[in-house]
Swiss-Prot record:
Ligand binding (beta-alanine): 60
Described function: Catalyzes the condensation of pantoate with beta-alanine in an ATP-dependent reaction via a pantoyl-adenylate intermediate.
Molecular function GO labels: ATP binding; pantoate-beta-alanine ligase activity
One GO-annotated biological process of the protein: pantothenate biosynthetic process
Keywords: ATP-binding, Cytoplasm, Ligase, Nucleotide-binding, Pantothenate biosynthesis
This protein's encoding gene: panC
Xref: PANTHER family: CYTIDYLATE KINASE/PANTOATE-BETA-ALANINE LIGASE, PANTOATE--BETA-ALANINE LIGASE
Reaction it catalyzes: (R)-pantoate + beta-alanine + ATP = (R)-pantothenate + AMP + diphosphate + H(+)
EC number: 6.3.2.1
GO cellular component, one term: cytosol
Quaternary structure annotation from Swiss-Prot or TrEMBL: Homodimer.
Protein name: Pantothenate synthetase
The organism's taxonomic lineage, starting at the top: Bacteria, Pseudomonadati, Campylobacterota, Epsilonproteobacteria, Campylobacterales
């Protein structure tokens, strides 16, 4: 496995692989890897080569968010990549990614102003800008992203289409802890009491899925049922609960096919997200 920190060296390695007609699966991460990331790596191994990038992107954090405290453990991450058959770990620093007079950004007029985008101003501009750069540097064939960041997946798919990137975005299922909590690098922030309270988030998701399966169409009733579960936990403060069209992120009144049910909530000071998808509904 190659551990590369230089953009120039990463581009040269990719160029060599491409000259031998090798396909590339790419997993973008901010590090502090967990089983959710490793499931993406496993999916990426259908390609000839697998690249994992580790970069805590300052551009996608707001002024009062957790950039400085975001969990980091490079040595552990590199070992996990090595143990799981990754071919290249790319770890650039911010000085390389954003040169002194950096002034070019990728932004979007729609989709990014809903859900997390409405709450985290500038977040998706940071995400799109850094991923556009990574796509140019690493030239992947398929990019593997987790459904837990569902809005991000849709935003990036739109960027790929709009800017004619020659790659495919593959969305992979949410990976959960045994008790149901969606795996997240930020779970490490939770105290024992907060960790217990956080289960209300996944419980609200599972209840909503059950209601949809039982035929409930009224989104206001589903949202209220989710709200009731979350409000029972004193440590939880709801950021949003929404049911939206998965492609447009527009709110809907009645359940149909291709709907995203999404929750964001603060457990203590930690903001967690979770969601479910309604697909294949007849």
């Amino acid at each position: 496995m190659e551990v590369i920190t230089s953009i120039k060296e990463a581009k040269q390695t990719v160029k060599n692989w491409k000259s031998h007609n090798l396909s590339i699966g790419y997993v973008p991460t901010m590090g502090f890897l967990h089983d959710g990331h490793l499931s993406l790596v496993k999916n990426a191994k259908t390609q000839d080569k697998v690249i994992v990038s580790i970069f805590v992107n300052p551009m996608q954090f707001g002024p009062n968010e957790d950039f400085s405290s975001y969990p980091r453990d490079l040595e552990r991450d590199i070992k996990m990549c090595q143990d799981n058959g990754v071919d290249m770990v790319f770890i650039p620093d911010a000085a390389q990614m954003y040169l002194k007079n950096f002034s070019t950004y990728v932004d979007m007029n729609t989709i990014t102003d809903k859900l997390c985008g409405a709450k985290r101003l500038g977040h998706f501009r940071g995400v799109c800008t850094v991923l556009a750069k990574f796509f140019n540097i690493l030239n992947p064939d398929i990019v593997y992203m987790g459904q837990k960041d569902a809005q991000q997946c849709v935003v990036v798919r739109h960027m790929v289409d709009d800017l004619n990137f020659d790659l495919k975005i593959q969305i992979c299922p949410i990976i959960r802890e045994e008790d149901g909590l969606a795996k997240s690098s930020r779970n490490v922030y939770l105290s024992e009491e907060e960790r217990k309270a956080s289960l209300a988030i996944s419980q609200s998701i599972f209840l909503a899925e059950k209601l949809v399966q039982e035929g409930e169409k009224d989104t206001s009733k589903i949202i209220q049922a989710m709200k009731d579960i979350l409000e029972k936990e004193k440590l939880i403060k709801i950021d949003y609960i929404e049911l939206v069209d998965f492609n447009t992120m527009e709110n809907i009144k009645n359940i149909a096919d291709n709907v995203l049910g999404a929750v964001a909530a603060f457990v203590g000071k930690t903001r967690l997200i979770d969601n479910f998808l309604v697909q294949g509904l007849k």
